[in-house]
């Protein structure tokens, strides 16, 4: 069902498409067919030859199918240019516009003035009829507010400013003086030069600046006042736009001031070139085909035909206006045709024909003219269109130019001053600065006065400078012949740029400080200092060739090689030493415990000597552990148990490894070469990832600081070190020496000098950011080439090498450092003094301990003697008491004995009774007696009567009358034989401390 409906509707859809497209197609055919088939081209020409050539050109055009479509015919309508502009206007209306001209080609006699072409332009422009001028070059025709439909196949005069820029770039002139009239064309050429130079110099290296602008009123009578200002200026290159009459006055007065001779450069426009007193050596411009009316007529006709052909193919062209009186006519096709004309770009008889937005001819060729003797004009160059590059190109044969003063060599273009203002800065070893003493009136022969720059203080002149750069300056001034005033940097800085926002400016402007700022602002002529060449500075000042090539390096304090008293401890870290000490005592304790609690630790052989070695105690265990560690002989106090001996073997192995490692590491540590630096260079990971205990810095605002800003890969490092940057290099170097700063990043020349002067400092790693030190000069300075050539000669002659040895490397100091570094790394007393001191400390400790022991022993002996004396006195006192008791007992026994003799008891019975009373058990054998001082004889006398017999026998009792037993006398003798001393009695104690005096 759906398919059937679609088949039924399809014819209706096709019909609708046809009905819609048909009107459009018809309109297109109408557009092409409704365009006029005939086109009238008007001509307002200056002479009959031009009129005839105009007619002939249009006739030939009709046969050129490249420019004329089929069924299109061109016709010419010409009138003669009248000197009266009002008549010209009426002629244009009556003879051209009434004939429906689509465009007008106009020319005039240049001597008759420019008002006639302006009249044609005003009249035609009112009706939007395009006008193509072939001779009018005044700047006024570029104003589209007035000449709304005017084009020209010749460039305006002020376009010669473009050629001036090309010539200045070719001759490398950087400062110029512009002389121009105060009329429209004069001001237009100045504006064109200033505007074009802003974009032109973005593509070239040499930038020309306008030092002075001299504007004069036309129809001069005298130019003397302006010449006075020009003579005081530095530039000697004059760009002049003036009429032929005014140029005669200027050249006349300039010749009187000797400003047209040697050393001066004049580049003038076409009008001035035709002055009858143009000096020899003047360079001027002359437009190619400037007076070829026929060529310009042909080019204008073909440009017009090309535009109409393209317009016919794209849109409908309405008929041109027919009546000047019809003010209501607004011919839009004329405006569109004017836009098509401006977009043309063809190759014609006068060269490449194209137009800018103002309808002015571009790509016009010029001849560079050199004025010779007798006003002869010689072509020495061309400024023409290069079809390969699609742009204009300057070609000048310098060898054919004769400059003012009949010179073949190109002038410098500026007045070269022979007395210069020089600036420097204190930077060792390149510039040393000292203040003069109160009694000094002049500097030393190798010094030069260097007051502070622009300082009115009287003390500012009391400085003298010497050093590498000062010696270079002295030799440089002799070589290229100049005098100078030397001054110090006012703020002590090389200078860096600050971005400032000028009033009314949309972009930030760089403003330089320090030495660079003085040079940029032209307050100084030259900088003689260790000034690093870098892109930021080279954009604003000029540099000579480097007088010293260098780079950036790192300064650090050399790792200490001095031997301390504990050098022998350095092979092991403090932690390891502590662990070893702890291990000794832990092992000793474990050995003691193993030997103490082992069941075999106190085992003795049954038949062993009673003096066999005792078991291991704690003191012996410590002694054993230390003895094994120190590899000393162990004669006693060894472990007895198996478990303790196993641990002892393990400890011996541990001690062997520790001692061997210590010995090897000691040899490597004290004898082998140690690294000279802590850092390996700029790529050291510790710098790239800066740690808290590692500080690095440079000088803020310096060339090194700019280098780190440029390098993206160093951005992280720069952010870290930026806060640590110093104001001067001197402060940073002092902090490196003191250990406050670990790494100072600066120019290699300065750091190598510091390292050669102080053996404690060393540069780390390879150079990076290689550059050089150069002499700084103003942009366009005439001294640049001379200074560069002189420096190159100094390099070739060896003078720069001599300065390096004299000021930077300090040969004798460096040699001493090398001797220090190359000393054989053998062990000496300073390396091992700590060991000897340790032995001395051990000896002193032993002597001290023995003294303490002796003193302590003497104290103990004295105390023991006092105790012995007291004990002896107490024993004597007790003995005396006991003797008295014994005497009493003896007397009692004697009395009893005597009584017994007289009684019925037998003597034997009495003796037995006495013995029983004294000895409850007579069979008990008395133990061994101890003798104490002074009682040996008493003991024998006392015990002799009571000596016991052999076991199993009765005691042997001696009678009083027995020999050897004297009969005691009453009151005089005590019977000592019957009573023992009290200390042999049961319960006796020897404590006599209470008797000690």
From Swiss-Prot:
Gene3D superfamilies tied to this protein: 3.40.50.2300, Periplasmic binding protein-like II (3.40.190.10)
Function of the protein: NMDA receptor subtype of glutamate-gated ion channels with high calcium permeability and voltage-dependent sensitivity to magnesium. Mediated by glycine. This protein plays a key role in synaptic plasticity, synaptogenesis, excitotoxicity, memory acquisition and learning. It mediates neuronal functions in glutamate neurotransmission. Is involved in the cell surface targeting of NMDA receptors. Plays a role in associative learning and in long-term memory consolidation.
Gene that specifies this protein: Nmdar1
Location of the protein in the cell: Cell membrane; Postsynaptic cell membrane; Postsynaptic density
Compositionally biased residues, Polar residues: 987-997
Transmembrane segments: 574-594, 652-672, 832-852
Binding residues for glycine: 530-532, 537, 703, 747
GO molecular function ontology, one term from the record: glutamate-gated receptor activity
Gene Ontology CC terms: NMDA selective glutamate receptor complex; postsynaptic density; postsynaptic membrane
InterPro entries per record: ANF_lig-bd_rcpt, CaM-bd_C0_NMDA_rcpt_NR1, Glu/Gly-bd, Iono_Glu_rcpt_met, Ionotropic_Glu_rcpt, Iontro_rcpt_C, NMDA1-like_ligand-bd, NMDA1-like_N
Signal peptide start-end: 1-26
Keyword Ion transport: yes
Subunit: Forms a heteromeric NMDA channel with Nmdar2.
Family affiliation: Belongs to the glutamate-gated ion channel (TC 1.A.10.1) family.
SUPFAM superfamilies noted in UniProt: Periplasmic binding protein-like I, Periplasmic binding protein-like II, Voltage-gated potassium channels
Region (Disordered): 947-997
Major location (coarse): membrane
Glycosylation sites: 258, 314, 345, 397, 454, 481, 501, 693
Cytoplasmic side: 595-651, 853-997
Bilayer topology annotation: Multi-pass membrane protein
Protein name per its UniProtKB record: Glutamate [NMDA] receptor subunit 1
Top-rank taxon: Eukaryota
Ranges of the Extracellular topological domain: 27-573, 673-831
Name of a matching Pfam family: Lig_chan
Organism: Drosophila erecta (Fruit fly)
Keywords: Calcium, Cell membrane, Disulfide bond, Glycoprotein, Ion channel, Ion transport, Ligand-gated ion channel, Magnesium, Membrane, Phosphoprotein, Postsynaptic cell membrane, Receptor, Signal, Synapse, Transmembrane, Transmembrane helix, Transport
One GO term (biological process): long-term memory
